[in-house]
From Swiss-Prot:
Record-listed E.C. numbers: 2.5.1.145
Gene Ontology terms for molecular function: phosphatidylglycerol-prolipoprotein diacylglyceryl transferase activity
Domain of life the protein comes from: Bacteria
InterPro entries, per the entry: Lgt (IPR001640)
Binding positions for a 1,2-diacyl-sn-glycero-3-phospho-(1'-sn-glycerol) per the UniProt entry: 137
Pathway it works in: Protein modification; lipoprotein biosynthesis (diacylglyceryl transfer)
Top-tier EC class: transferase
Source organism phylogeny: Bacteria, Bacillati, Bacillota, Bacilli, Bacillales
Pfam family, one: LGT
Membrane topology: Multi-pass membrane protein
Species of the source: Staphylococcus epidermidis (strain ATCC 12228 / FDA PCI 1200)
HAMAP family assigned: Lgt
Protein name: Phosphatidylglycerol--prolipoprotein diacylglyceryl transferase
Length: 279
């Protein structure tokens, strides 16, 4: 790893012709740490220790695939002329919102198959997801991507950032906003809040709280980024999706509180799939 010239090599090490990149290592570490944290929550509600294995396995696979499809779709003018680049996820280009959609769909399907309550599982994994996202942003840092607009070195020094961050934000002759860091800090704060409040919230509200918290932060950070996926020349996809997620989450939480008066998470115990077929 070369840091002497202010540059961290995205490749951690090589095994023959195979390059092992920091991007993948960091994302894997985020998922692994999130898994262990979620395991502790399983025990607290009385669910079996192996409950999350299938959910995480399939959600991770489907999530990565959908995240890549999502990214490629909005960058199709480039990829249509560079088809060989589509599977190269180690170069970056994984959209979190796409991963969230894919992971959510596969998670619900597995919950149905395993007869698990999706809101309870969502509450269990929500803090882990946002923490993994916060850790994963450091993979963007290593890849020199997902940064904001140009700034001066003096600006970065004014933020009292560690020197290795300042050096690595010097990309092709210019310093840039470390937007990866802003979002990472926001996500870690969200993790602490969700873990702290989870027991006091109604069933499902920790997961929707995650969607709200993450989306608010993403909306503002996205405005600073230079590599946003664009729906039109003025509408950033991530900002639009963030607004939609916030509205859906707020409406759903209010509706469930008024209509169903859901139980608290801490009183839930082991729950099964809540939707029954009409007789």
């Amino acid at each position: 790893m070369n840091i002497t010239l202010g540059y961290i090599d995205p490749v951690a090490f090589s095994l023959g012709p195979i390059q092992v990149r920091w991007y993948g290592i960091i994302i894997a570490c985020g998922i692994l740490l999130g898994y262990f944290i979620a395991q502790a929550a399983l025990k607290q509600v009385g669910l079996h220790k192996d409950t999350l294995i299938d959910i995480i396995f399939y959600s991770a696979i489907v999530g990565f695939i959908v995240a890549r499809i999502y990214f490629v779709t909005f960058q199709w003018p480039y990829y249509m002329n560079h088809l060989s680049e589509i599977p190269k996820i180690w170069h970056g280009g994984i959209a979190i919102h796409g991963g969230l959609i894919g992971g959510l769909i596969s998670g619900i399907i597995v919950c149905k198959i395993k007869n698990l309550h999706p809101f309870q599982i969502g509450d269990i994994v929500a803090p882990s997801i946002i923490l993994a996202q916060g850790i994963g942003r450091w993979g963007n840092f290593m890849n020199h991507e997902a940064h904001g607009g140009p700034v001066s070195r003096a600006f970065l020094e004014h933020l009292h950032l560690p020197d290795f961050i300042i050096r690595n934000m010097y990309i092709e002759g210019q310093y840039y906003h470390p937007t990866f860091l802003y979002e990472s800090i926001w996500d870690v704060i969200g993790f602490v809040i969700l873990i702290t409040l989870r027991k006091r919230l109604k069933l499902g509200e920790t997961f929707f709280g995650y969607l709200i918290w993450y989306s608010v932060g993403r909306f503002f950070v996205e405005a600073m980024r230079t590599d946003s996926l664009m729906l039109t020349s003025h509408i950033r996809v991530a900002q639009l999706v963030s607004v939609v997620l916030i509205l859906i989450s707020v409406i759903f939480v209010i509706y469930r509180r008024v209509k169903y008066q859901p139980i608290k998470y801490e009183n839930s115990g082991p729950l099964t799939w809540p939707i029954k077929k009409a007789k």
